[in-house]
């Protein structure tokens, strides 16, 4: 209960906290896992992964450094070792990034994504993204350099707080389609060349076709989902020229279509709500068709109990 006792108690507390922090760092530094990843990349890609020896040496050197610091902190209770922990963590993360991002399959430089705060911007599983139009969102289309930290770039941010999403990157990697508040737009990956492509009714969820035309969803039919008493309009697949002209409806389904994407064989994969031949009513089947809308048929999911819904085909 005196000053000396209080000082001793503080010392024990600080030692306990230091030991806990060091143990957390030690648990996060999984060197065997990184060695396994390096061995897999080296054996799998061989000449396409030329820095294997360099990374092995760096891992060995880091392991010695980490063991020395952990010993000093946990056995000798060296305060300097605790101070060095943040730098050790940064070195570990840099080593992980270098080893894993040298994967030859990661042969691109930037990641394109939608950044959204507050709300995920998700609908119920039977609805289309037209249900998001008119709602307030704090979101933008952005990109960052895969191999550089803190290098985020805003490509498009709407002037008003409205939905932006449904991004589809062009084959050349220089432009993209996206939807915002019922309009399909196109913009360059550098943020230039913004233009409206489809402005008819509620249009969203676009997809480039190899011949230059565009697929997209539209509720132009003005029919609605029957099991919610017509409370949600149905979006079906439509086709248009690159400039938005020549719009033609391809699907005439009772309920929504979603997420068109081009398969390697040139056909279009998409999802469709289906009441027929269904094991239960949560039914988003994968369908495929020719780009002109012909030969629509099931791809996967008819009479399959699990998974009961498929998203983002």
Describe the residue ranges of each PLM region.
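Long amphipathic alpha-helical scaffold segments
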Residues: 2-20, 46-154, 161
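Alpha-solenoid helical-repeat scaffolds
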Residues: 121, 137-139, 145-189, 198, ...
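Multi-bladed beta-propeller domains
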Residues: 149-162, 188-202, 241-255, 290-309
């Amino acid at each position: 209960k005196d000053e000396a006792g209080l000082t001793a108690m503080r010392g024990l507390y600080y030692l306990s906290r230091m030991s806990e922090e060091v143990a957390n760092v030690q648990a996060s530094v999984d060197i065997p896992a990184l060695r396994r990843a390096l061995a897999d990349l080296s054996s799998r890609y061989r000449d396409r992964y030329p820095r294997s020896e360099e990374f092995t040496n760096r891992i060995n050197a880091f392991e010695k450094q980490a063991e020395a610091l952990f010993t000093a902190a946990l056995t000798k209770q060296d305060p300097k070792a605790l101070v060095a922990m943040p730098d050790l963590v940064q070195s570990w993360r840099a080593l992980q990034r270098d080893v894993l991002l040298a994967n030859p399959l990661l042969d691109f430089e930037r990641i394109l994504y939608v950044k959204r705060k507050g709300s995920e911007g998700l609908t119920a599983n039977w609805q289309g993204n037209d249900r998001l139009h008119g709602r307030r969102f704090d979101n933008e289309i952005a990109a960052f350099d895969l191999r550089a930290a803190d290098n985020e770039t805003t490509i498009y941010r709407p002037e008003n707080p409205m939905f932006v999403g449904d991004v589809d990157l062009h084959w050349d990697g220089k432009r993209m389609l996206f939807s915002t508040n019922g309009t399909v737009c196109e913009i360059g990956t550098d943020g230039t060349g913004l233009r409206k492509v489809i402005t008819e009714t509620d249009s969203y969820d676009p997809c480039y076709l190899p011949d230059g035309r565009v697929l997209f969803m539209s509720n132009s039919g003005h029919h609605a989902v029957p099991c919610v008493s017509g409370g949600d309009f149905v979006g079906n697949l439509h086709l248009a020229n690159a400039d938005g002209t020549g719009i033609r409806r391809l699907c005439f389904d009772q309920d929504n279509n979603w997420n068109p994407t081009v398969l390697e064989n040139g056909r279009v994969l998409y999802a469709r709500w289906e009441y027929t031949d269904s094991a239960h009513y949560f039914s988003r089947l994968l369908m495929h068709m020719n780009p002109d809308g012909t030969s629509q048929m099931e791809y996967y999911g008819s009479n399959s109990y699990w998974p009961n819904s498929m998203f983002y085909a």
